[in-house]
Amino acid sequence: MIEPLLCGIVLGLVPITLLGLFVSAWNQYRRGSGLLDMD
């Protein structure tokens, strides 16, 4: 039985962590490729 608090913390942190990784990867991709210069 998983504690509701722990389950809530995990469900709250996982999307934020994935979003942070995606944003950092997207920023490196945009910075690395100067060909696609879109605003």
Swiss-Prot record:
Superkingdom assignment: Bacteria
Record membrane topology: Single-pass membrane protein
GO MF annotations in UniProt: electron transporter, transferring electrons within cytochrome b6/f complex of photosystem II activity
Broad class of the protein's primary localization: membrane
InterPro entries per the UniProt record, alphabetical: Cyt_6/f_cplx_su5 (IPR003683), Cyt_6/f_cplx_su5_sf (IPR036099)
Gene Ontology terms: biological process: cytochrome complex assembly; photosynthesis
TM annotation in the entry: 5-25
SUPFAM superfamilies: PetG subunit of the cytochrome b6f complex
HAMAP family: Cytb6_f_PetG
Oligomeric form and interacting partners: The 4 large subunits of the cytochrome b6-f complex are cytochrome b6, subunit IV (17 kDa polypeptide, PetD), cytochrome f and the Rieske protein, while the 4 small subunits are PetG, PetL, PetM and PetN. The complex functions as a dimer.
Similarity field: Belongs to the PetG family.
Role of this protein: Component of the cytochrome b6-f complex, which mediates electron transfer between photosystem II (PSII) and photosystem I (PSI), cyclic electron flow around PSI, and state transitions. PetG is required for either the stability or assembly of the cytochrome b6-f complex.
Descriptive protein name: Cytochrome b6-f complex subunit 5
